[in-house]
Amino acid sequence: MMNMQSMMKQAQKLQKQMEKGQAELAATEFTGKSAQDLVVAKLTGDKKVVSIDFNPAVVDPEDLETLSEMTAQALNHALAQIDDATQKKMGAFAGKLPF
């Protein structure tokens, strides 16, 4: 069994690696798209919206519901990518905990 000092060193090392992973994710930009790429949302890995771009074909003052649905679709697509990337990058640390 590991002694306490060794466990603490390993935990500190893992914490630094996790912080680095979180910073890398935050600096990464993810792009989500609606059907036919009519709405494109760009978010950072820490889930901050960078931009939302609309194809003029989807902007119809008489049909704002479709624009709203496509915007939500694009945002959810980007958020799913962020969640997947986070799980891949940060999930690896769960098995490395010394306790």
Curated annotation (Swiss-Prot):
Subcellular location: Cytoplasm, Nucleoid
One Gene Ontology cellular component: bacterial nucleoid
Function field: Binds to DNA and alters its conformation. May be involved in regulation of gene expression, nucleoid organization and DNA protection.
Disulfide bonds: none
Species of the source: Streptococcus sanguinis (strain SK36)
MF annotations from Gene Ontology: DNA binding
UniProt keyword list: Cytoplasm, DNA-binding
Protein name listed in UniProt: Nucleoid-associated protein SSA_0326
Spans annotated as Disordered: 1-23
